[in-house]
Each structure stands twice: as structure tokens, then as C-alpha cells.
Amino acid sequence: MKKSTVQYILALVICFAVGCGIALGLNAYDKNAELITPISGGQTIDFSAYGFTLTVPDDFAMNDYTTNNAAEGGNALFAGCAYGEIGELYIFCYTNDSGDELRQYGEQEVVTYYMNAGATDVRMRTLGGRRFICYRATVNGQDGEETWDTYETWNEDIQISFETRMNPDDVLPILATITFTSIAQTN
């Protein structure tokens, strides 16, 4: 082989190795950026009827809109809002009639589906040990366009959806407190 051919191959190998190193570094940085520190203190809200508990800041209050949701034609098992100084977190729980689970779908498949539906900033996150699809959508509200972030998960029984206009730096530490439980049986 000619000296220039060997140098060319060596340059390709070095470029490949450098590219792999950069990719590994970016992956490690992204994984570190995904670490979310849960809020400390706060008050725990018991949603065991829907299979979870959630801790919110001490100044938060809770409104139950389930009756209003049903009166407006909604089918939520629970519809409510936890709210405080930093904003509002709407919480919806639905029966999962399809019986599927988010974890049975590949990440790329889910992200592509939501992006094709018009969502932006779509990504998967793990909160409370369960996968969530997280996305942003812009909707036309009474006062013009509004941007909402949704954090959604489902298993074979229940679909849980958190919707908010709060900054992700404020809402993610709250959502990081979610603990999944068995669904409490009601008589």
C-alpha cells in the first residue's frame, strides 16, 4: 500500500474514534442532565385510588374538578388541579380501555407518533420508576395561543396525565416525587 493510502485510512480511524468519544461524552452529559432532584418537604397527596402518590410544595392546594369534567362530557376518573405560588399542575386519570402499556412501545415509535401529531420537545423520561412521554403543545385559548407541557404515562389499567404551563425546572422536581402503588380497592 502507498503511504498516502495508509495515512488516509489512519485519518479515518482517528476521526471515527474522536467522533465516538464525542458521542459518548454528549451521551454522558445528557444522562447527567436528566437527573432530577425531587422537592424536599411538601405535602403528599394520596391518589392510591389511581395507583400513585405525589408530593407537592407546602403552599399548594388541591381542587377536584371531576364532577365538572363529567358535566362537560369528559370521562376522567379524576380531574383536578394542584396549585400554588409557582403555578398550576392539572392532573387527569382515565381508565385505559385499550389495555396497552407505554413501556411496550419503543422510544422512537412513541416520540415519532407525538411529533407527527404536532407536539414539540418530545422526549421520554423515567419518573417514579415508570416511563413517561413528555411533550409540548401550543393550543388556542381564550387569550390567544397557550403553550402547555404534558407528562403522560399509562399501564394496562390507568392513564395518568399531568398538564401545566409551569417551567420544567419547577414541575419536574414535583413529578420526581411520584410513587406508584397498587390501586386501592373501593367498595
Locate the predicted segments by residue.
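Conserved polar/disulfide-associated segments of primarily extracytoplasmic proteins
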Residues: 66-166
